[in-house]
Regions:
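N-terminal glycine-rich phosphate-binding loop and ensuing alpha1 helix
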Residues: 1-60
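Conserved beta-loop-beta/alpha segment of the NTase-like Rossmann-fold superfamily
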Residues: 65-140
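Conserved core of the sugar-phosphate nucleotidyltransferase
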Residues: 111-184
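ATP-binding glycine-rich loop module of kinase domains
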Residues: 231-262, 280-281, 285-286, 290-295
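Active-site acidic catalytic loop and adjacent metal/ATP-binding pocket
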Residues: 240, 368-420
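Conserved kinase catalytic-core helix
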Residues: 265-271, 291-356, 362-378, 385
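Active-site activation/catalytic loop segments of kinase-like enzymes and analogous catalytic loops
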Residues: 412-473, 490-504
């Protein structure tokens, strides 16, 4: 049967609050895959999708065309997707000319486990829910929908899940247009479907997962969380998605993406080959292997450090370049740290003060920062660098010539793309030996704050502790400055505290402050 699929995707996603600040809600991550992928992958490759877009339209267009180059998408730009006159029905009606045949309607926040039947007849999807109050519902008699109810309906009703097959498309479009002044714009597809009841609408049960509000999204993520073996801490302005045996990196920063793509050519052979990119995303083939963090061992870590010596090729600089590099390091370490600490205080409404951390009285953070020998810190060693070197970004390859692949490389070092400071890679590696993303993701840490008294604790893996001990020996045997690595590790915690969620942000800040106190 020939039919199309309409995925409504023009709205703002207000019920998700700040989570849809940078992307359309269709791209909200579920087990490191956008919600809309769970919809697209329910259908055969030859099915065409018609997608009305408005809010953050480019993010949907870019993601779908990058991730599914062999599928057909027709994007309909909706001119009015917020404010007076806008509504789900308005967005749907902009797609009429593309849907002059039976079609399936689905919202972009509806995920179901079962196969979705073609629209050989009119049908509406429903599910059993504990609370129907926030959903439209269906009254069903003798295996037919007899009433499409408004939100809050009482009695024996089933929640309508925003998924329907529309066989009588001509009648549907006629009623949607006739009802512009009677509510079709605000109500949406349910308005047109009400007029198809007399032609019979089959109720179809589904196992349903909603992603359109915070509470439902949390339940959906909990169900799907084991679908991918990765420990990626969520960020507001970045995402990594796994889809169709590909990896998609997203960032709101277009310069970030452009620089990442360029740098991938500088470090070719050590990182995945980027196959395609847009202004906010790039895509590469998923590498077969296991992230180092899953099963770290001393023997593999030793092998990795030997391999990295092939990567860390030192760059010879002339006098002017040396001076410029030192200034870049000073700005990258000192200026950025002061800026990020101020950002942390603003974001989490904290103040700089003397505090008792794990029973020890510690001065203000800016007093500690002022004690650092920044001249020494800025005296970097210029090498080919990675920039975010921790075990989640190191893949142990299961095939191919190279034993490892480096992931999620930094786009530049203070504006420099060809080289950066080897000590930054050392500190990044060290910070990941102390804090395990996997254990943080499982909430195996605690932070208690009462006035100026703070207690924190976090679980560590014994094999990572052993790797940390070996790393100290390795650095000292290679005549690198271990104290400098420790200082920079503390600075990394202070820098990233402003970028992560509460209360993990507190752990990072107070761990960094505590480490710095012991060093300076």
């Amino acid at each position: 049967m020939k039919y199309k699929v309409l995925i409504a995707s023009a709205g703002l996603g207000r019920r998700l609050k700040g989570m849809s600040k940078n992307v359309n809600k269709a791209l909200i991550s579920i087990a490191h895959k956008p919600a809309i992928s769970y919809i697209v992958e329910k259908f055969e490759n030859d099915i065409e999708f018609v997608i009305p877009v408005g809010y953050k339209a480019d993010t949907i267009k870019d993601y779908l065309t990058l991730s599914y180059p062999d599928r057909k998408f027709t994007f309909v730009d909706v001119d009015l997707y917020e404010g007076e006159g806008s509504g789900l029905g308005y967005s749907i009606m902009q797609c009429e000319k593309h849907l002059q045949l039976p079609f399936i309607f689905t919202s972009n926040d509806t995920i179901v486990l079962e196969q979705i039947k073609p629209p050989k007849n009119n049908w509406m999807g429903y599910a059993q829910t504990e609370d129907n109050s926030q959903y439209r519902s269906l009254r069903i008699e003798k295996r037919k929908v007899v009433e499409i109810c408004s939100k809050g309906a009482e009695g024996d009703v089933k929640a309508y899940i925003g998924l329907a097959g529309i066989f009588d498309f001509e009648d549907f479009w006629s009623e949607m247009k006739n009802g512009v002044n009677q509510g079709s714009i605000e109500i949406g597809e349910s308005y047109g479907l009400r007029f198809l009841i007399e032609k019979d609408i089959e109720p179809v049960p589904f196992t349903w997962f909603d992603t359109g509000n915070i509470e439902a999204l949390e339940k959906t993520r909990k169900y799907f969380r084991n679908d991918i073996d990765a420990n990626i801490l969520e960020k507001e302005d970045e995402a990594i998605w796994f889809v169709n045996e590909k990896v998609v990196k997203f960032s709101v920063d277009t310069k970030f993406i452009e620089s990442r793509v360029l740098r991938s050519k500088e470090i070719s052979g050590f990182v995945p080959e980027i196959l395609s990119s847009t202004k906010n995303m790039y895509l590469y083939k998923k590498i077969k292997g296991e992230v180092f963090s899953k099963n770290p061992s001393i023997s593999t870590f030793k092998y990795f450090l030997d391999w990295m010596e092939l990567f860390w090729i030192q760059k010879e600089l002339d006098k002017r370049q040396e001076e410029d590099f030192k200034n870049v390091c000073l700005n990258f370490y000192k200026d950025k740290t002061y800026k990020r600490v101020k950002q942390y205080f603003t974001t989490f409404e904290q103040i700089d003060c003397e505090e008792i951390i794990n029973g020890v009285k510690i001065p203000k953070i800016f007093d500690l920062l002022d004690k650092i020998d920044w001249n020494k810190i800025a005296n970097g060693v210029p090498v080919r660098f990675h920039g975010d070197l921790h075990f989640e970004n190191i893949l142990i390859n299961s095939e191919g010539k190279s034993p490892f692949t480096l992931l999620d490389w930094r786009q530049d070092f203070g504006g420099l793309q060809e080289y950066g400071d080897i000590y930054y890679d050392f500190a990044k590696l060290n910070h990941g030996l102390i804090i395990s993303h996997e254990l943080i993701d499982k909430n195996l840490f605690e932070v208690k704050q009462k006035l100026n008294s703070i207690h924190y604790d976090f679980l560590r893996k014994q094999n990572l502790v052993e790797c940390e001990i070996y790393f100290k020996e390795w650095l000292e045997n290679k005549e690198y400055d271990y104290k400098k690595v420790q200082t920079m590790t503390a600075l990394i915690y202070l820098n990233i505290a402003a970028l992560h969620h509460y209360p993990y942000s507190l752990l990072l800040f107070y761990l960094g402050k505590n480490m710095l106190q012991k060093i300076v």
